[in-house]
Each structure stands twice: as structure tokens, then as C-alpha cells.
Amino acid sequence: MQNIEKINEEEAKKLLIELADKIAQYNHAYYIEDKPLVSDAEYDQLFNTNLKLEQKFPHLILENSPSKKIGAKVENKFAKVTHQVPMLSLSNVFDEEDVKDFLDRIKSFLRLDQFSPIFCEPKIDGLSFAATYKNGILTTGATRGDGYIGEDITANIKTIKDFPHKINNAPELLEVRGEIYIEKNDFTSLNQEQEQQGKDKFANPRNAAAGSLRQLDPSVTAKRPLKYFVYAIGSAKEELANSQDQLLAKFKELGFNVNEIGKLANSEEEIFSFYEYLKTNRKNLPYEIDGVVYKLNDFALQDRMGFIARSPRFATAHKFPAIIGQTKLLSITVQVGRTGTLTPVAELEPIEIGGVIVSRATLHNYQEIARKDVRVGDYVFLQRAGDVIPQITGVDLAKRSADATTFDPPLFCPSCNSKLHYVPEDIIIRCDNGLNCPAQNYERIRHFVSKNAMDIEGLGRKQVEFLIDKGLISNPYDIFFLKEKNEASLTKLENMDGWGKKSVENLFNNIEKSKNVSLPRFIYALGIRHIGEQNVKLLAREFGSYENFIAQMELLKENDPEIYQKLNNLDGIGDKMLVDIIDFFDVKENIELIKNLSEVLNIEDYKETREQSSLTGKIVVFTGSMPTLSRAEAKATAEKLGAKVAASVSSNTDLVIAGEDAGSKLKKAKELGIKIIDEAEWLTLVRDI
């Protein structure tokens, strides 16, 4: 990652675009597919780099910035549930200095003279949920989703053995929030069952819990050893408690499971002592934790602190450092991806790290292998922090044997044997044989049918491989004629190994259903290099319809300067992406495929709906000293209500809130005839909204 201090504005703009797309992909994999692509540590590093860039260049903040989003958008297979109170995620801190900064911000924001108690509790590594009770009866269970809309998992949540379906002495409306998880021993047993049944093993307990809870068939969920803790309230008709410690006691009284390991800290020293205690003893806990959550204990103070776009100001998560292990590197294999990129993968002597057996690790790229001087036969250090593919962080040179061998990058593609070329700006080696490369063609079809693209359920990795091997499909277009081909064949698909009448029938129904596709999904399904989910929405919004999109792409391919500039001006599309788009539409086979697909698909025009709040778009200015509010708290409240807070008064200003010694801004507001109110009127306005 580049040095943030030395980066210039143009470099920052490009990097922010790349980060937005990459983080969006990682969010979807983690929150929706329950298959994380990177470690927690790597994700946190990317997210914090994005934050630092935005702090340095605030005018470059993108509309699709990760700092504005929570989780990922929900899938269509579950009914949607709107969270009346958004389910925000927590910001992260990584060392004592970060924690001290967090505590200082609380003091400054609230103008406190002394330390306000902080409640500390373990950060369970599971799946967040919300459960709503009406008159004591459980009516709705939902996932976090994107923080605003989650998935309805009511039937599944009811299968958890000790989850209350009814609570006594409850308010008319109560929404509790917490974490669903699987204990370490249960996870080991579950993976043994998966292996015995010939199914894929779960990467870690968090993935197992998430995958279990998001089953379409509740009877499958019922067989999984799910447990839960509640730790927060979403909404209630009456106040249950005045503080976090009181709330947990109330939850316990109502019959919910709460984590008994928690501490009310009255000083920084007590906070750090509790963190060290949990870090040292987490291996003895029956469940996985990945840090400690710190919350301002007093709810009245929490309300004053409020929220930023994706997280509360009054709480944060102090993450544990990654777990390190050591094992032998047996070999290095090479994988060819959808866009031709070759990725080296370390094959390892199996080792248990944090309760998970690890036998493979990512090596990222060949430059990384050379930089770390990783050799086959070495004993390597592994880092794992809840990720599906751990990372090699270094080599134990003291254990290096004389026969440890360096790994030379291949000169020819292991799939199609075509000559490879090095792409220095991306630090990668690539095969440019496109659809003529079996590995790329396979991965491209896999991408085309994936959840975020055409979403054809029943075409997983094994099924796609089978259909290609049998010559039933050779490109995405063939999928839509699979039923006709099967009907004309002497050997029916349902009679082949791994298939049955019902699975084939469901597959054909899903293929038919996928023919109605939105423009963003269609563009994403094409698999254009560097063009992710967020970018396709920008393109779809710009062009509106498939016909216009294709017409504009033809102009772009012909180097039309007007369309090139129009796309380059889009907030989220960079030069590198434009080159990749041009390269894609310059390939004859791609144009033919798109034309063929357009004849069998109904590609729907792009439609966007935006929700407006009562103050959305209003420009307000605070000036002078407020009697009770800090400037930060006043600004936060305004932004929470949808207003934009400006630093100066202009003819575009809608409202000025003036305190003592307001000065020139107040004078200008009077001259322009802008509405002016004081702090008391502002607080009344806020309360009424």
C-alpha cells in the first residue's frame, strides 16, 4: 500500500476508486455469501487506508465510499426486513493509542471534565441479528444486511434451542440485537459431519453460523448447534434501562442469554487490564472472539454522541492481533483466474491455528514471494484472523534446509500453454488467451452464473465443471439452450452421476427465471476486468438502458473523446477501468457473446429509488458559541437529520443557528434574508422532527 503522507491528489483519486470496489466485493463475500476473501487484518488495513485518504482529501469522497456503507445489500432469496433503527457496525481500534484517542473524543464531544464509565465486553465472532417481539411474542428475526434492510430469518431463528419465542413482562414492542455463533467443539464436530457426507467443510465457526442461519430450509438450521447472546436494543415502546450494564441485567431477567464476561471500567487502566486478560485467556473460551467492544455505559450520553455514517461515536471494537502459526511449505501451485491473472497458492503441511485446520495460504503475487524469500521446503509463519485463506507473513530462516528451492514464475499458462506476460503496474502475470484458455473460460462461466451476476441457483463449481467436461456448455450463451439440448440427447442429464430429476427440473426453472435481468447485473455478469458491483451501478445509472450502453461502448471502442471524457468524469470510474472496458469491447468474441445474450435475455432498464428525509439537502450553518452543545455534537445532529453543514454563509444557505459572538456569518445571513435561530430553537426543531 502506498504511503498516505506522500500520495498526491491524482493518485488518491485512483486509489479511492480501487478501494471502494475492492471493499464492496469483500463486504458481499463476508456478509452475504459467508465466504470471506481476505483476512480481518487485511480488510481493516484497506478500510483504514480509505479513511485516511478521505481525511486528507475530503473533496474526493466517493458516492459509493465504504465509509458510508454498512455490511452488504441483501439477496433476493429471503424476504426483506427494514430496520426501524439502523443496525450499524463498529469502528475498529488496534492499539492503546487508538483507544486513548477514542476516549478523548468522547470527553471533547460531550465536554466532560472526568472519565465516564465504559462497559467492556467480548466481541463474539458470529452473525449479527435483530429479533422483534410484539406483546412478548417473537414476530421477526432479521440479519444485519446493509444496516438498513436485512433478511427475514424468523423461521430459522426459532429453531435455536433456547431462543425465547415468548417473553413475560415485556413491553408492547421490543427489538433485541445480538450475535449468533457456534462453539469451537461443535464446529469441529460439524465439519467432521460435512466431510463424512462429502460436503465442503466450513472455513471457521463464523462462516458455519452464518451459513446455517441463512438456509432456505429451517430444518437444516435446526440440525446445526447454534447459540446466541443478546447485547443491545434496537427499539422499544418503553425504556428498559439507563445504561449498558443495566440493560444486560434486564435481558437476563427477561430470559435471554447474555455474555457474563463483561466489565464496567472506571479508568483507562481498567480498560487495558480487561483487554489483556481476554487476549490471554480467549483460547480457553468455548467460542471465538476477535476483540473487545467498548461502549459508553450511560445511555443518555450515548444519545448525545449519536452516530456517523456507518458506526456509533460512543462505541468501538478493540481488535486482537492476528493469530500466528508455523508449518512447512510443501509446494506452490498456480491458479488461473477469470481475467487471466495467475495467483500462486502455498500448499502446506496441515496445522491448527485458532481452532481451524489450515493447509493452504495465499501468496498474493510473485513479487511477494521474492520479497519474502519464500522457498519450497521452508518453515513459514502463518497469520490467521478469521479469514478463509491465511497469509504467509515470513520465513523461519533458522530452519531453512539446504534443499529448499526457489520458485520460478511460469513462462507459459498451466491451463492453455500460451505465453504469459508480466503486468508491472498490477504486479501480476497474466494469460491473454481469453476464452480460448480453459481455466479462464471456466471461471468466466462461474462468474456469469454467480449470485451477484445472473444468479442461477444450481450451477455451482462442480456442476459447471461437469457440464463443460461433457460438452454441454462452452460459454454463457449455451446455458440458455441446455434444456433443449438435454431434450434432444439420448442420455438425459437427470440420469447422469450427481444429477436427479428434481435437481435438473429446478436448474431449468432457475435458468428460465434468470432471463429477466437488471442492467447492472448483466454488465457485472460480463466479467470485465476491474469492473465490480459498484462500478456497474455507475455505468447503468449513466446509460439507463442496454441499447444505450452498447451504443456508447461502440463509440468508446472507436476512441470517441466525448464518451471517454463523460465516463472519466464519473465519480468511481478511473483511467485503468476505461482501458479495461475498451480492451473488453475490442475482442470480437465478447461482442458476439453480448449480441447473442441480448437475444435471449430481457435486460431491464436501470431504475433508481432514493429515500428522502425531512431535511435532506438543506444547508445549515452554525456560528458562534453554543450554550450547551459542542460544535461537533451540533454538526452531528444536523447531519443525522439529513442536513448538509456548511462552513460559510451563502445565498444557498437555508438556515443559520447562531450562538454568542456569532460575528460576520450572522451579519451576512441577515443581509441575505436567511432564517436565523438560536440553540434553544434548534433543539426544539430537532426534538419535533
Curated annotation (Swiss-Prot):
SMART domains: BRCT, LIGANc. Zn(2+) binds at residues 413, 416, 431, 437. InterPro entries: BRCT_dom, BRCT_dom_sf, DisA/LigA_HHH, DNA_ligase, DNA_ligase_AS, DNA_ligase_CS, DNAligase_adenylation, DNAligase_N. It is an enzyme of class 6 (ligase). Its EC number is 6.5.1.2. It catalyses: NAD(+) + (deoxyribonucleotide)n-3'-hydroxyl + 5'-phospho-(deoxyribonucleotide)m = (deoxyribonucleotide)n+m + AMP + beta-nicotinamide D-nucleotide. GO terms for cellular component: cytosol. Its cofactor is Mg(2+); Mn(2+). Keywords: DNA damage, DNA repair, DNA replication, Ligase, Magnesium, Manganese, Metal-binding, NAD, Zinc. The active site is at 123 (n6-amp-lysine intermediate). Residues 610-689 form the BRCT domain. One of its GO terms (biological process) is DNA replication. NAD(+) binds at residues 40-44, 89-90, 121, 144, 179, 295, 319. The keyword Metal-binding applies. One of its GO terms (molecular function) is metal ion binding. It comes from the Bacteria. DNA ligase that catalyzes the formation of phosphodiester linkages between 5'-phosphoryl and 3'-hydroxyl groups in double-stranded DNA using NAD as a coenzyme and as the energy source for the reaction. It is essential for DNA replication and repair of damaged DNA. PANTHER family: CHROMOSOME TRANSMISSION FIDELITY FACTOR 18, DNA LIGASE. Belongs to the NAD-dependent DNA ligase family. LigA subfamily. This is DNA ligase. It comes from Rickettsia bellii (strain OSU 85-389). The gene is ligA.
